[in-house]
C-alpha cells in the first residue's frame, strides 16, 4: 500500500472490500494539536539529520543504509503502543513494531528519493500467526523488491554480539511468500531477485564446492559465514550434504561448526569455534514477535522439511 508520508500524529487504518478496486483510508489522530506540532518538528529534524550522510549514495546503497540503521538502532517493542506503531517509535524512541518500522523505512527512503510503499499481509491462526505483518516494497533500478527490515532485525538481535542480517533484503514474490502470508491489498509484482543482498555480495551459492571453499576460509580466518543456497530446493538431503562439507572444513582446521538455518529463505549461518562442544544446528524462524523462534538440534537429527520445523515450533 502506498501510504504517502505517514507522520507521527496520525494512525492510518484501512478498509478493503473483496472485488473492489478501492482501498479506504481512515485517519485516527493519536495526539492533540500542540503535541502533533511538536512531534512533526522533531521528526522533520530527525529525518533530515539521518539522511544527510546517504544523499550521494546509489539507490541500492541508500536502501542498505536505511535497513542497517533500523537493524542497528531499533528494538522491537510493542509495549509503547502509541509510539511503536508510528515513526516516532523507531525514529524518536528507538523502539517499534513491524508497522512503525515499515513506516520509518518509507519516510527515510522517501526523503532519500527512493520509491517505497508499505505492504501488509493477513494473520493465520491455523499456522500460529496471530497478527498481521507489515514490511516494504522498494523500487531499485526500476525493479520492485520486497524489503522486510523487521524480520532481519529479529534475526540479528538474538546473539551476544548483534549482527546485521540481510535474509529479507530485496526478495521476489516467490521468496517472500515462503514465510509471509498473502497480501490483504494490491501491491506491485516483484519478479526479480538480481539485487537480492546475498547475490549482490556473491554469497548466493549454486555449487556445493563453493560452500566448502568459503567454509574453509571462514574456519581458517575465524570469521562468520552467512550464505544463501540457490542450487535447488533446500531439502533435508541437500542440507545434510552441505552440513557434511561445513563439518569437513572445520575438521581440517580443528574447529567445531555451529550452524543456524533460516530454512524458508535457505540462508545458512556458520561460525567455527575452538571449544570442544557438540556440533548443533539452530533452526531459526524470523517473525514479528519480540524474539524469533528457534529449535536446536544435532547434526544427525534434522527434521524432514520446513513444515516439520513449523510443527515443532507450534508444539
Which functions belong to the PLM regions below?
Residues 162-312:
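Low-complexity, Gly/Ser/Thr/Pro-rich intrinsically disordered linker/tail segments
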Residues 77-84, 95, 116-127:
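Catalytic cysteine-centered active-site loop
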Residues 82-92, 96, 100-107:
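Conserved active-site-adjacent core of cysteine acyl-enzyme catalytic domains
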Residues 13-40:
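Short glycine/threonine-rich beta-strand-turn micro-motifs
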Residues 66, 70, 98, 109:
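Conserved hydrophobic/aromatic pocket- or pore-lining residues that grip, position, or stack substrates
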Residues 100-175:
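Hydrophobic/aromatic-rich core segments of domains that either
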Residues 1-7, 11-12:
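Single conserved hydrophobic/aromatic residue that forms the stacking wall/gate
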